[in-house]
Amino acid sequence: MTRAALLLALMLTGPLGAGELWLTGATVMDGSGSAPVAGLSIRISEGRIAEIRREAAPKPTGEGVVHLGGAYLLPGLVDAHAHIETPAAARRALLSGVTTARVLGDSYLKALGTRDLVRAGHAEGPELLVSAGHVRPRLGEPFLLSFPQFGRYLDQPLEGADQVAEVVRAVLARGADVIKVGASERAGLAGTDPRRPELSYEEMRAAVAEATKAGKFVAAHAHARAGANAAVRAGVRSIEHGTYLDDETLRLMKERGTFFVPTLAIMSPLGDPRGDSAEAIALQVRTHHMQKPLRAVVKKAKALGIVIAASTDGSYGDGDDTARVRVAHDVEELVACGFTPLEAITAATRDGARVLGVESRTGTVAVGLEADLLVVDRNPLLDTTALFEPMLVITDGRIVLDRIER
């Protein structure tokens, strides 16, 4: 929404209704890339943004009013690539300001169960869109224990479009919101080579066809040039990681409207010898040397106008190197790659929602959208570290974190 459109949306209102919440004195960054607008009030009703108005209008009073005193109000953050698997991790993500997350990969369907607990109101967390697995030639023990009908792949690889389509149908039937395919090998294991392709064009095309029938998108784990190029031609929604993308693939992504989720922030902890991965020397060295080419790719993608979304690739859990990564770290990484702070915040809000296909519901501050909101105490355009310190987090109109001084 443009600045002009935001101001046009300002309206007067009546008395405070039951179950309503007012946020007054807000400096609103609406997530669209427009400059902040000071002196606004937001009315929330039935979990949605019902009204945005000028502070000059009669101020509401009552228990359902939070006076922000000029603090900065943004859309809740979108983590476009996470590995949230437990209710505790989901709660940590939410309290960090993440109100929507796409979980790509799932061990023993734990993320799927956590998603269902959150949706049923039994656990606190962001809205989770879950892949319920990783479709690749070697499906792995966690996948096969969750889908024992594919036990024949315990000792042999998945191969061919028909086999891939069968697996994708099963994952969708289990309730997946998105399909994750392996276009290249993993980077996070010392014994794999992220430059080596995995699924073929025909296999990924079959995955896209099955997902499309179900109204779902496909995300491609892709570090390698060849694998990423095949994934884009196959019609995936997004390329994840993209460390070694070449110019041809980037141009193709721009032409096809393929989104890019580079997961920049995860590189630092995985390459940090002080972390839990310190014993895997090969992994440390690899991760450290992947940072430079990935940053170069991100700069090229930005210059081409490819839509880039922020993410963590993290677990928000306990006991692993990825747990401490936050979306705010990725905002800092994007700024280091030439984004303005406003562009980086847009990548963490509206553009993340676009990647997930939920931009009609969340990702911006606009009348009619879900009240997924984040408040910080200082201007994040001048100091992006403000995003590490949320003062207020609201999801679906409910306050889940409140550090506002009264």
Residue ranges of model-derived segments:
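Histidine-centered divalent metal-coordination motifs
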Residues: G25, A71, L77-E85, H221, ...
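Active-site core of metal-dependent hydrolases
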Residues: L104, A183-R295, A309, G314-D318, ...
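Bacterial N-terminal signal peptides
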Residues: A4-P15
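Histidine-rich, glycine-flanked metal-binding segment
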Residues: G19-L21, V28, S32-L74
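Divalent-metal coordination cores built from histidine and acidic residues
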Residues: H67-L74, A90-K216, T249-R251, R256-P269, ...
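His/Asp/Glu-enriched, well-ordered alpha-helical/loop segment
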Residues: K213, K292-N379
